[in-house]
A protein has these predicted regions:
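Conserved functional micro-motifs across diverse proteins
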Residues: 1-78, 82-186
């Protein structure tokens, strides 16, 4: 009877060890996901992954001109930027605004493709605006965070965070579509 227990005990022990090992590997991959944050500044060419970015600035207003005025209980923020890729065409993951407390703000829905991300091409720079809606009290402490294309979502990656200089406007913000830039322009 004893000789039959040892193989069963050994198999249970092996199964527990394999399960614990798999959990440790999975937790390490997930825990290391977006940990590295590269910092950049407005006005310069920056690269993260295969995305090249140039942030020109941002403007905030409580009113958006979307064929008719749209008001916000907070503020609309329009980030002026240009970007391209280093290798191939793709649609970047939507950037987010991050406030001083680490809260993230994504683009609001309902405004069509104006004010949202656009296709990026290899060294083909487009300039446009990305629209966000944030509480008014965080406008002075915002950064924009870019997350490059991830081929392996579980592997560690780098994000680019650029602090924004946001000017305030009483005029409604106007959305437009991105335009292709001449060679060397940003």
């Amino acid at each position: 009877v004893r000789s039959r227990r040892w193989p069963v005990i050994a198999m249970i022990g092996l199964a527990l060890a394999i399960g614990a090992g798999a959990n440790a590997v999975e937790q390490n991959h997930l825990a290391s996901g977006w940990h590295t944050v590269a910092r950049g500044d407005e006005g310069g060419d920056l690269t993260v992954g295969n995305l090249q970015v140039h942030v020109h600035g941002a403007v905030a207003s409580p009113v958006l001109d979307d064929d008719e005025p749209v008001t916000s209980p907070g503020s609309f923020v329009l980030v002026d930027l240009s970007y391209a890729t280093t290798d191939s065409w793709f649609l970047p993951e939507s950037p987010v605004l991050v406030d001083g407390d680490g809260r993230e703000y994504t683009e609001p829905s309902g405004f069509g493709s104006a004010g949202g991300v656009w296709m990026a091409g290899p060294d083909i720079w487009y300039r446009g605006g990305l629209l966000f809606e944030v509480p008014t009290d965080v406008v002075d402490d915002l950064s924009i965070e870019f997350r490059p294309e991830r081929t392996q979502a579980l592997l560690p990656s780098t994000v680019l965070r650029v602090p924004l200089t946001v000017s305030l406007s009483a005029e409604p913000l106007v959305l437009g579509y991105p335009t292709v830039l001449a060679e060397g322009e940003r």
